[in-house]
Amino acid sequence: MTHDIVVIGAGPAGLTAGIFAVRRSMDVVVLGDPTSMSTMEEATLVDDWPGMPGVAGPELFAKMTAHAKKLGVLVKQEKALEIRSKGKLFVVKTDKAEYEAKTVIIATGAKHRKAMVPGEEKFAGRGVSYCANCDGPIFKGRKVAVIGGGDTAATYALLMEQIGAETSLIHRRDELRAVDTYRKELKKSKVKLILNSVLKEIKGDKMVKSIVVQDVNTKKLTDIPMDGVFVAIGTVPASELGKNVGIKTDESGFIIVDRSQMTSVPGVFAAGDCSNNKTKRIVTSAAEGSIAAEMAYEHIREAEL
């Protein structure tokens, strides 16, 4: 069986692509990786989704998934392993099956950027986390550090304070990059800001016991007792799948797309956080997914596939 579209990724970009595909009466399957969560699922609070201010990320994800399935989008929990060309068509291999498609939409999102400091790998899952929404509750009444200065770091710090953790937010610059809304909330909170400081090491025995922080100006090192560390310093694109068919990426690894979300390979599109579009938001990922589906429809018609 040949599908019109195979969408790789079941986050906001992938699900929206699926929705717009079925509205065009196309045969589409959306493949969600069961081993990872989308950034939407991990989001503590989504303040910029129109009509639903303050919605929790998992709630928005559940509603979007339900919407897609209600319209008839086939969503499968399978990990995509490879894309390969087959004449004018494509084959997507997963850990369970192979899918032949006229077009492919890559919506694999991005992965958490690591701090790359001693102890990070050793204590992953033993005090080091990249998702406060997932692991936050176990740190109630304990000391935690959130590393980063953007929106994600700010929301993690606010969430950890709400949970009841003694929270420090550590950022390398003299002011946060987070939007004003979150900065104002942090000022009203009990979150301790440690600015002009970088994480140098995570220490412990079986679990995290402390972190070493360096002042960027004085170079002084300080050992601070901690039970948990949440790393929130951005993401790197999950764009490896496209390399097998020759898809071009930029210097940071993001998939290069044009205004139609088409990659350098005709018939393969990319949408969401894995693309090289500058704005990384849930709402823009959804928009890119809709464009990719519409343009895939046009590509199939024009190529007479």
Feature-to-residue mapping (PLM):
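A Rossmann-like FAD-binding core segment of flavoenzymes
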Residues: 62, 68-94, 98-101, 162-259, ...
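Beta1-alpha1 glycine-rich phosphate/pyrophosphate-binding loop at the start
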Residues: 3-71, 152-179, 192
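FAD-site-proximal beta/loop scaffold in flavoenzymes
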Residues: 111, 116, 122-138, 233-281, ...
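Glycine/small-residue-rich loop that forms an oxyanion/phosphate-binding "nest" at active or ligand-binding sites
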Residues: 75-138
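Residue-level detector of alpha-helix initiation sites
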Residues: 11-12, 110-112, 150-152, 276
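Phosphate-coordination loops involved in phosphoryl transfer and adenosine-cofactor binding
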Residues: 2-4, 77-78, 140-142, 196, ...
